[in-house]
UniProtKB/Swiss-Prot annotation:
Belongs to the isocitrate and isopropylmalate dehydrogenases family. May supply 2-oxoglutarate for amino acid biosynthesis and ammonia assimilation via the glutamine synthetase/glutamate synthase (GS/GOGAT) pathway. It comes from Glycine max. The record marks 142, 215 as: Critical for catalysis. One of its GO terms (molecular function) is NAD binding. Pfam families: Iso_dh (PF00180). This is Isocitrate dehydrogenase [NADP].
Amino acid sequence: MAAFQKIKVANPIVEMDGDEMTRVIWKSIKDKLILPFLELDIKYYDLGLPYRDETDDKVTIESAEATLKYNVAIKCATITPDEARVKEFGLKSMWKSPNGTIRNILNGTVFREPILCKNIPRLVPGWTKAICIGRHAFGDQYRATDTVIKGAGKLKLVFVPEGQGEETEFEVFNFTGEGGVSLAMYNTDESIRSFAEASMATALEKKWPLYLSTKNTILKKYDGRFKDIFQEVYEASWKSKFEAAGIWYEHRLIDDMVAYALKSEGGYVWACKNYDGDVQSDFLAQGFGSLGLMTSVLVCPDGKTIEAEAAHGTVTRHFRVHQKGGETSTNSIASIFAWTRGLAHRAKLDDNAKLLDFTEKLEAACIGVVEAGKMTKDLALILHGSKLSREHYLNTEEFIDAVAAELSARLSA
């Protein structure tokens, strides 16, 4: 076969390297599936824990700022250190979650979506199409002030306006017994508006209907605000575009939406408040079969900046085997899709049809290989259960090699 004419990519992408087993497969993906085919300017940031520690986590902030500059980032899974990791790596500090830091700088909404393979059975067999879930990653319980109340007394909520104006006081509860618990949480109009814009942009790009779920019957003002802002944003900027694409936006009660989700066939974008999104994204991942088949894209309110990553962790258990020189069978599909989703966005921004075609062929190669029966151990286990034996699966590198061979065949077809 003649040497492949590399596809030129006009603008750079930001690459964020990561940790452990995912760092190992990341390099392999880059060397075998990306660099042989693309002429690409990569702005590289090492978000591996040792370098984050060395730079006092500045590298994480720099990588997020570069993302705002270049509009496309592709991220490998990273360790968020706990006490044990601080000891293991001899860290200067227990650094925060890089994903949290990046999310706060980009002010984005996280969208998760499963990768479907016909031969991998789903726990919810009715889900024949993907469901893309968007989680509002700001405020509510995650930025709340919660406290234990000891003894009797009044709990009040007070708002003191800046400058002129009267302060407002609400009596929340009168504790008469031995006390209890309390919680005060908030969100901002700006953040809800950004969430609405990102959700609508994602739905339009996919040409899928959009549902927002809240409990506005109980939280009439709090959740009512989400409902109202979404409706305003929809009417102002998206309604005509949605109608032209034959899709729609609808608000649903969270309990109705969960029931609908379970009996639906899929094929829509589900916008969730922070806590609901935290819970329901794991419900979807399990229902579709595997976190190893879950993509995650952070979409910014500017409509042009995204960061793509795998929805899973750094696969420490496999890395320990790899460190000892043992054979691993780690699923690289979600990490490959981080590259394809990021590059597909680059292609759309640059109007690069060849690059877009390449990303579609790489995704099809991954799915094609699995559907032809070549897969890693985690997927083979879903298929074969207790009857699983070594001939049913490929090891980490064999799988990436199989995808590379399939990709080359599709590109030369």
